[in-house]
Amino acid sequence: MFAVSSRRVLPGFTLSLGTSLLFVCLILLLPLSALVMQLAQMSWAQYWEVITNPQVVAAYKVTLLSAFVASIFNGVFGLLMAWILTRYRFPGRTLLDALMDLPFALPTAVAGLTLASLFSVNGFYGEWLAKFDIKVTYTWLGIAVAMAFTSIPFVVRTVQPVLEELGPEYEEAAETLGATRWQSFCKVVLPELSPALVAGVALSFTRSLGEFGAVIFIAGNIAWKTEVTSLMIFVRLQEFDYPAASAIASVILAASLLLLFSINTLQSRFGRRVVGH
C-alpha cells in the first residue's frame, strides 16, 4: 500500500545529489574543462603533430611498458601480501599491514630519492644486481620499480577486503571434497577474487601512467630512453606551451578513462551474473 521509507544516515536525495554534483563539477569537471579549453586553441593538424612527435611517441612507449610491468608485478605481489595479511596471524602483522599504506603517505619525491639511492650502482640493491649485469637506475626498469612502489597499495587494499569476506571456510570445504590447496585456490578463491584483482591492477596501471615525482629521480630523464609522458608535459609547461602539454596529457587521460570504463563495465556484468545465479 504505502512505501515505508527507511531511516537514512545521509540527508535527503536532493541534497545528497546536489552536493555530489557540486563536488564533481568543482573537483573533476572544472580541471577537465580547462584542459579542453587549452586543446581548443589548437587545430586538428597541430594536435596530431604534437601527439605523434617521435620523442613524445617514445615517451608513450616507455610509460606504457613500465606501467604494464609495474601493474603485473603489483598484481602478483599485491595478491600475495593480501593473502598473508588475511590468512595468517604472526608477530608484526599489524606493522606490515600499516607499511602497505606507506607509499600513499610518503611524498613521491622522497620515494624517488630513496629508490634511486638503493638501486644505484653503489646502492644496497644496485651493487648486488650489478653482479648479474642488471642495471635499474636510468633505465625503464627503474621507472617500473618506482611505479610499482607508488601503486602497490591499490592492489592490496582492493583484494584484502574481498579475501576477508570470503573466509577460509570455502577452501576448507573444497579440501574436504578432495581438492588440493592449489586446486581450491584456483577453482574456488581465484574466481571470486578476479573482479577485485583486475580492478586493483587497473587502478595500479592508471596511477602509474601519471607518476612523476618518484620517476624523475630514478629514470635520469634520458631523451628517447627514459622520458615518460608526465615529464614531457612538465617540459612543455616550463616552455609555456600549454596547448601542447594539454595535448600530450589528453592521450594519457583518454587511455585511463577507457581502461577504467572497461573495468567498471566488466565488474557490472560480473555482478549481474552472480546475482542471476
Curated annotation (Swiss-Prot):
It is found in: Cell inner membrane. Part of the ABC transporter complex CysAWTP (TC 3.A.1.6.1) involved in sulfate/thiosulfate import. Probably responsible for the translocation of the substrate across the membrane. Residues 60-263 form the ABC transmembrane type-1 domain. The keyword Transmembrane helix applies. Coiled coil: none annotated. Belongs to the binding-protein-dependent transport system permease family. CysTW subfamily. Keywords: Cell inner membrane, Cell membrane, Membrane, Sulfate transport, Transmembrane, Transmembrane helix, Transport. InterPro entries: CysT_permease (IPR011865), MetI-like (IPR000515), MetI-like_sf (IPR035906), Sulph_transpt2 (IPR005667). The chain crosses the membrane at residues 17-37, 64-84, 99-119, 136-156, 185-205, 215-235, 243-263. GO terms for cellular component: ATP-binding cassette (ABC) transporter complex, transmembrane substrate-binding subunit-containing; membrane; plasma membrane. This is Sulfate transport system permease protein CysT. It comes from Escherichia coli (strain K12). GO terms for molecular function: ABC-type sulfate transporter activity. GO terms for biological process: sulfate transmembrane transport; thiosulfate transport. The complex is composed of two ATP-binding proteins (CysA), two transmembrane proteins (CysT and CysW) and a solute-binding protein (CysP). The gene is cysU. It is a multi-pass membrane protein. CDD domains: TM_PBP2.
